[in-house]
From Swiss-Prot:
Disulfide bonds join 121-184, 223-279. Belongs to the MHC class I family. It comes from the Eukaryota. It comes from Pan troglodytes (Chimpanzee). Glycans are attached at residue 106. This is Patr class I histocompatibility antigen, B-1 alpha chain.
Amino acid sequence: APRTVLLLLSAALALTETWAGSHSMRYFYTSVSRPGRGEPRFITVGYVDDTQFVRFDSDAASPRMEPRAPWIEQEGPEYWDRETRNMKASAQTDRENLRIALRYYNQSEAGSHTWQTMYGCDMGPDGRLLRGYGQYAYDGKDYIALNEDLSSWTAADTAAQITQRKWEAAREAEQRRAYLEGTCVEWLRRYLENGKETLQRADPPKTHVTHHPISDHEATLRCWALGFYPAEITLTWQRDGEDQTQDTELVETRPEGDRTFQKWAAVVVPSGEEQRYTCHVQHEGLPKPLTLRWEPSSQSTIPIVGIVAGLAVLVVTVAVVAVVAAVMCRRKSSGGKGGSYSQAASSDSAQGSDVSLTA
């Protein structure tokens, strides 16, 4: 009955709601073996868009799926019990995957090894699946991945081809596709609705341009965007109306520590020609794109405190990612979160009923 109610509610949302832009739900699972020191450590983090909302750590005193965002705390005890069971089942499956990988690669059990999975879904403004993901890595290298068609696999090497043949025989891609098109999107809609005050907000960026002389002949113009949410933003420099993409230095979007983000884009320009350059900013929170120039009479002062705070959070984030997913090869696609699809998991779970696959 609860499953039926969820499906009905999801169908109603799909018909009546429109979402500002696309949204994503992603899970990352990481298992790290430690010979002589017990079972592998298993860590899970889940994200909706840029917000972490759940975490599981097998090394905790009492391992449970734990909330990491206020809006997920409204889920009842059954939710947390179910997700905890799924995590424990996934941890066991990934331990087996580590043992299988040792055999496939003819490796010794003496060393430490890592098995990781990333899976999830992107949802379009119409509330339907935009793209699904299912990617696996072993010891920091691509192992096998679900293709964009959600019906076939790409194996990275001959060992992964063994897994590919096994999964093709079991028609695992069909099960994965059903989860991504159904359960994954259904739960993403539910989370977006429950956390709409934070997840569906649009904080516009605070913008300015700074000027940094390099020599008597050149200077750097840096276009700043601070305090925006969601993280997706576009910064471009133009010279006399022509894009300067190839000559632009663009940093990755960085967290500021207050659930907003910052980013900058810089170009080196000939001294005296600064006014020929314009910075163009596009963001969901802006009613229309912004166009900025450097104003010589009022050199912008960089808000050092905010930037330092952002860099501090970036360091912490990188440290966490190093434990959870740093060794997973980055793909050009935006990707979802990973984990193994547990055969024993309840179909009411946000993780789905087929998330943990043995290699």
